[in-house]
């Protein structure tokens, strides 16, 4: 029996800075234009007040060239001035080929991750295994982080969000004898 183990989050060398006003929604808006395989954004976003279940997300387009269908998605983030009930989770969804998503579609996969929220700040670092090939032929696959809350206040959220598709860096562990 062999296991694949991802030992650390390898953040991209370059990053994008985002300073914008965003309105959380049930169809969570995408924070920035998705890159291929990996992306880190420095976020300084002003959120508008919303009193319903809603969210924001940061995603990347998944590289489908690898013949294996299962890849690790490493995600990490640290944000301040967030709602006390905010949670973060990994998501995966598909859109038609060539379409750049501006919001998460109605159908998406959710993967739980380890999240720490102290009421004013949230941090997380985890890895999940996702299907990297589209389930519907001709679609593009996107995956990333969704930030979700029952109610958002008008505030400025600051921090870092990072998503990395790990498709080449895996260490194979053998069981002890």
From Swiss-Prot:
Could you tell me where this protein is found in the cell? Answer: Virion
Signal peptide range equals: none
One Pfam family this chain carries?
Phage_G
Q: Which UniProt keywords apply?
A: Capsid protein, Host-virus interaction, Viral attachment to host cell, Viral genome ejection through host cell envelope, Viral penetration into host cytoplasm, Virion, Virus entry into host cell
Domain of life where this protein originates: Viruses
User: Its GO biological process terms?
Assistant: symbiont entry into host cell; symbiont-mediated perturbation of host process; virion attachment to host cell
Any one Gene Ontology cellular component term annotated for this protein: viral capsid
Identify its protein family. Answer: Belongs to the microvirus G protein family.
Give the record's subunit note. The virion is composed of 60 copies each of the F, G, and J proteins, and 12 copies of the H protein. There are 12 spikes which are each composed of 5 G and one H proteins.
Described by its record, this protein's role is as follows:
Attaches the circulating virion to the bacterial lipopolysaccharides which serve as receptor for the virus. Determines the phage host-range. Probably triggers with protein H the injection of the phage DNA into the host cytoplasm upon conformational changes induced by the interaction with host lipopolysaccharides.
The name under which this protein is listed is Major spike protein G
